[in-house]
Amino acid sequence: MQLSEIGGHLTARTGIDDLMEDLFKALHSEEAGLCQLNGGSPAVIPEVTELWRRSMAELVRNGKFDVLVGHYAHPGGDPRFIRALVRFLNERCGWNLKPENVAITQGGQMACFTLFNMLAGPCKDGCVREILFPLCPDYVGYQSQSLCGGVMFRGIRPGIRMLDAHTFKYVIDFDRLDIRPETAAVCMSRPTNPTGNVVTDEELDRLREMTARAGVPLMIDNAYGPPLPNICFVPVKPAWDENMILTMSLSKIGLPGTRTGIVIARPDIIRAVVSMVTTSSLCPNNLGQALVTPYLEDGTLERVCRETLTPFYRRQAEFALALLPELFGESIPWRVHKSEGAMFLWLWFEGLPITCQELYERCKARGCFVNPGYHFFFALPEEEDQPWPHRHECIRISFTQTEDLLRKGLSIVADEVKKAYSHS
């Protein structure tokens, strides 16, 4: 098969391909005892799942299910869901949104794909416009979303702040950060996937000032952030203005299978997003919107996130963090990024004698799936690879699994890391 240039970009093997295949294998394999410590699949929390069971039963009972699956939805999203979301965000965040500020897509991944290729890439004037990531590493799912290849993305290496002997935090290096004439937008996830980092309110305010002054939008991937699902372990102030594009998702509230993404932006951007949704898929999936709307309207969703979802992930993070000194000890140079949100730990093994890709392969051979960290540095120039080994020394761990599987999986990782250092 002969692929077009765009086909070549979209089918190139990247980290997200391995991630999704490993995720499916670990979750659905008949092989017992596999440790799925990769991927962003949320935990199955009974109290949350019960909400969706009740909502689905009501849709079947009142006859709305037939319309839900038998008719196309509006290409911009379900009007009732959008009205409920706008009302909720305005009340909780003090914003002044209108329905014209919201569009629904087939998941947060598709929202970012649409926005990236709508704003950046080759332009009529011959310029290739870029998406700038002010703090790398960032979400591996962005890596293959460009229709013109890696030229669309540029990233900034972070500053590393040591907090104690085994804990560090990435910070934006504003001395390195430059918004250029070809910069189409500045983008980051907050809380950050893969590290669990939360860019501080002060850093965010500075980014907002810089992007507003440059006349380019600031995109925030809010898949884990406030006010929903609010998987944050430090205070985080929700932020939006007309120079910002905020993306959200229903995945992390327990509905990844419904593929429901949300874009919040000024009306001209929303109209363009809706046009691209219509062209690419006619309309977004309406199941997730229908399941969630009643709980948005009556406050149940916010309460369950506050009382059940966020505390669950905080406990999981604390349990996983407590395992690290026990399993890794003091014989090897291990560090973990400060866990401030999301559902991951980001481990750094300074001077690791093997690459993180080889560590991933060794763990996988023993039934433990992790994510090699170098994929998350996709936006950094290749020429920086040699002088900065850090990006080959990190792995991402998901802590959504049971305590037994977390202990088993992290024990495998610790064993393989110790072997690597001892054989160097």
Task: Walk through the language-model features, giving the residues of each.
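Short, solvent-exposed loop/turn segments at secondary-structure junctions
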Residues: 40-44, 109-111, 138-141, 191-194, ...
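N-terminal "arm"/small-domain region of PLP-dependent enzymes with the aminotransferase-like
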Residues: 1-76, 80, 87-91, 181-182, ...
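Generic structural signal for small/hydrophobic residues in well-ordered secondary structure
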Residues: 37, 85, 102, 131-132, ...
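Conserved core segment of the aminotransferase class I/II
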Residues: 127-131, 146-147, 156-162, 240-314, ...
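PLP-dependent enzyme catalytic core of the Aspartate aminotransferase-like
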Residues: 83, 87, 91, 95-96, ...
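Conserved PLP-binding catalytic core of the aspartate aminotransferase-like
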Residues: 332-367, 375
